[in-house]
Curated annotation (Swiss-Prot):
Gene Ontology CC entries for this record: cytoplasm
PROSITE patterns: RECF_1, RECF_2
Entry's Gene Ontology BP terms: DNA replication; DNA synthesis involved in DNA repair; double-strand break repair; SOS response
Alphabetized GO MF terms: ATP binding; single-stranded DNA binding
Family matches, as NCBIfam families: recf
Positions in coiled-coil regions: none
Lineage: superkingdom: Bacteria
Family: Belongs to the RecF family.
Organism in which the protein naturally occurs: Histophilus somni (strain 129Pt)
Gene of this entry: recF
Protein name according to UniProt: DNA replication and repair protein RecF
Pfam families xref list: SMC_N
UniProt keyword list: ATP-binding, Cytoplasm, DNA damage, DNA repair, DNA replication, DNA-binding, Nucleotide-binding, SOS response
Subcellular location: Cytoplasm
Stated role: The RecF protein is involved in DNA metabolism; it is required for DNA replication and normal SOS inducibility. RecF binds preferentially to single-stranded, linear DNA. It also seems to bind ATP.
Length: 358
């Protein structure tokens, strides 16, 4: 997938922008506060229906404006799509694909698989398990057409069960939820484990490129003891769950853990090494999607030079160029990108929310 054109209206300090992008690399240069990250945020929003910076729409809509509008032209081989999204201050979201109303954010997300690499993205490694579950679930969403409905049903059932836990006095009244919950828990966990295993070799191979001095290993944990039947566990833990007010064990506690030389990566790696590992994980997942589904990810790299030396920046850029992805890269100066000269690229300069092609 590639975005060939993007129109932005009233998104943060980007009041009126119309851009045509290169299918390869797009460099966005500007000082701090110029709107570089906001441009990446707008692209991300178009593909996810949410921001990676703020959950509050009013902070994203330009001052004294009722809404923001994003409109994009998307191309993949011989196919083209027109997508649009409007977010209003009242919270309403309007979406269109090829002129037709789109009711689900997942419709946009399916069209625009994206990998985001930002300085804050280290939470994938040093944050809680939810960040790593999201990493696995992103891959399954794009690989397995049945996953999203099962995942949505699982989350809905967990919410219903947690609400019921605060009202019931005996386990008998929970059985109606637990029969279906158990079925979905096993299905989602099976898919997660299979995907993690399929991704393992790609991760280890890519990590050898970026961190050859380390032996990186990965392991999947489903969220409860594999030797326990989940239905039995739910019944056994009823009193504890009721006291807590939520379901303690299950796929909502799953984790995908990383070790370097046998130790947790967050305990022994420097911040620079963690960023390299995070880049390797994002790259490996994007390349796995290309290999399995023949679909290219769009890569968004914010503050490209941060914590990466020139050699590693060049290595990452060469790998992205090789796999044929569309890439958006922000930097403060052109000098930070001087050794990265992909065959297909375009450079934009951003100042006070206004952008021009160089």
């Amino acid at each position: 997938m590639a975005i060939s054109r993007l129109i932005i209206n009233h998104f943060r300090n980007l009041t009126a922008i119309d851009l045509e992008f290169e299918r390869g690399f797009n460099f966005i240069i500007g000082n701090n506060g110029s709107g570089k990250t906001s441009l990446l945020e707008a692209i991300f929003y178009l593909g996810h229906g949410r921001s990676f910076k703020s959950a509050v729409a009013n902070r994203i809509i330009s001052y004294q404006q009722p809404h923001f509008i994003l409109h994009g032209k998307i191309q993949e081989q011989q196919h083209q799509w027109s997508v649009g999204l409007q977010k209003q201050r009242q919270g309403n979201t309007l979406m269109k694909i090829n002129g037709e109303d789109a009711k689900k954010i997942s419709d946009l997300a399916h069209l625009l698989p994206m990998q985001l690499i930002t300085p804050e993205g280290l939470t994938l490694l040093n944050g809680g398990p939810s960040y790593r579950r999201a990493y696995l679930d992103w891959g399954l969403f794009h690989h397995n057409a049945s996953f999203y409905n099962a995942w949505s049903s699982l989350n809905r059932l967990l919410k219903q069960r947690n609400s019921a836990l605060q009202q019931v006095c005996s386990y008998e009244k929970l059985k109606i939820w637990d029969r279906e919950l158990t079925k979905l828990a096993y299905q989602v966990s099976y898919w997660r484990e299979a995907y993690a295993e399929a991704l393992r070799s790609e991760i280890e191979k890519t990590c050898q490129l970026f961190l050859p001095e380390l032996e990186i290993s990965v392991s999947f944990h489903q969220g409860w003891d594999k030797n326990m039947d989940y239905a039995d566990l739910l019944q056994q833990n009823f009193e504890r769950d009721r006291a807590l007010g939520y379901t303690f064990s299950g796929p909502q506690k799953a984790d995908f853990r990383f070790k370097a030389n046998g130790l947790p990566v967050e305990d022994i790696l420097s911040r620079g090494q963690l960023k390299l590992l995070m880049c390797a994980l994002r790259l490996a997942q994007g390349e796995h999607l290309m290999q399995q589904k023949k679909r290219h990810c769009i890569f968004l790299l914010d503050d490209f030079a941060s914590e990466l030396d020139q050699y590693k920046r060049t290595l990452l850029a060469e790998r992205l160029q090789k796999n044929g992805s569309q890439v958006f890269v922000t930097a403060i100066t052109q000098e930070q990108l001087q050794q990265i000269q992909p065959e297909k690229h375009r450079t934009f300069y951003l100042e006070n929310g206004r952008i021009k092609d160089l």
